[in-house]
């Protein structure tokens, strides 16, 4: 008999990570999208999270800081966009932005 592994991403872990982001970065929106939001994630699936907020400097450096401070206990693919960039990318048909905004689960905002 084989046991099914526990999922890497849990509701409680998502809540803790989101709270850390909100407390430290004040994002306008935090949205879970992809397989975790659709409910068809496997036990080893990561969490795809879109964060919409204003920030200075490089989005790469900001994402690294957010991951360091947020210290997720699960694998995460963090997509960071300024509000105007998210709107522009949505208009261009960006599949990740559209998936997040049209079908994602709002964790904050």
Where in this protein do the model-derived segments appear?
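Short beta-strand->loop micro-motif that forms the acidic, two-metal-ion catalytic signature
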Residues: 48-51
